[in-house]
Amino acid sequence: MCFVLATNLPTMLYSSRKFLGIDRDNFHQDVVCPKCTKLYQIDETVVNNGRQSFARTCDNLPFLRAKRQKTCRAQLAQKIILKNGSVKFYAYKTYCYKSIIDSLETLLKCPGLEEQSEKWKSRKIDNDLYADVYDGQIWKQFGNWKGNKPFLDLPRSFGLMMNVDWFKPFKHWNDFSVGITNMVLMNLPRSIRFRKENVILVGIIPAFKHEPKSLNHFLNPAVDEINALWKAVKVNTHNSPSSTVKIQAAVLCFASDIPAARKLCGFLGHSATRGCSHCY
């Protein structure tokens, strides 16, 4: 009996969660136009004219300054007829997004993380040595241009570092590349700042024939949350489980390779006449 039980037990992490009924898929999914990358809600991809349903086409205007504006008109979903005769529509591309605020709240519920994020305030500082991000002028003076107290000196105020990169998830499929956007808390000591459990996964960009030239559509949900975090939001933490407390955050740094940084920040390409991201 023990042998039969052992053979039926799941052997992978995914199947174990499914076996135990643990749902960790807390991503919000949007349909992506395969041509111009505009995002749509899932329930917006199918249109019904009263007689039949059909896949919607993208109505985005990619070039707003063009004299002759043309809508994208790419089809968003594929029509599939199942064996039982029913019709289903499946999106060609989907974008998975995870709430930054929810991820921050999850991190702050970890024991000791709040205390770790405040350690930088009591560290020894050598004025002649730049040892970490805390020694730079941006970190020291950020937010005090109006004579206020520096933003990061306020309690539960966090500086975020954002990154975007592409990788090949399959070993023998070289032309398939998926992008991810993630963030880390720069308030944390460098020894634990980039640990896997402390990295915030923001979004998963689907594979395209060519990497998108612009990430604006994929960044829109993150920008909305970053604006909310700048004004402060209320969350529960490990030190305050029963009542909510205010937290603030701002993106201070973008850390990517040169091609990804151009797409993330809107800089000119590295082959441009004046392609320096510091000067221009």
What is each residue range found by the language model?
Residues 2-7:
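Amphipathic alpha-helical blocks
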Residues 8-280:
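Domain-level cores of phosphate- or acyl-group-handling catalytic modules
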